[in-house]
Amino acid sequence: IVYRVKLLRQRHDELVEQLRKRERDMEAAATARKYRKIAGICRLIKPKYEYTGEVYSIVVPSGVRDIMREGDALSHCVGKSDRYWERIEQQEAYILFLRKTAEIDKPYYTLEVEPNGTIRQKRTYFDRQNEDLKDAEQFLKEWQKVVSERLTESDREKAEKSKVLRLQEFEQLRQDDIR
């Protein structure tokens, strides 16, 4: 119950936000049921791909809900498209988070990464890549070297399949004249 008219708008906004969160939680639960392997895959890849540097860190999400929160926070398509869930489930690509180490819980960039550490996409707010990403390039190269040392033969085989699928997808986009 709202006793003061001036608080009505605030209370309305709070309730709308609660409803959005509840809807997103239900959507995350449905996606997690549909793609049951994702949480396990995230646990499995965490020791290989997670890495902390002085300025930047690579964080592995714990599952569907973390990925959806990242997409919502950065207002981009990760977490809204079955294509990403399918790629994770098939271990064709993984979604990882590039964060500033000092603000480890604050979304910065979302990465789509192949099993060998090849970065397919780097996106921040509104599917953009800003100039500030150049500051992280050296860190990302360092991270890729570390990941390369951690890979198993199975990871390398998955990476080869992933590369072929990526090239096929690019060719299909060219044929469809999608820019």
Q: Which stretches of residues belong to each language-model region?
A:
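Catalytic-core elements of nucleic-acid end-processing and repair enzymes
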Residues: 1-179
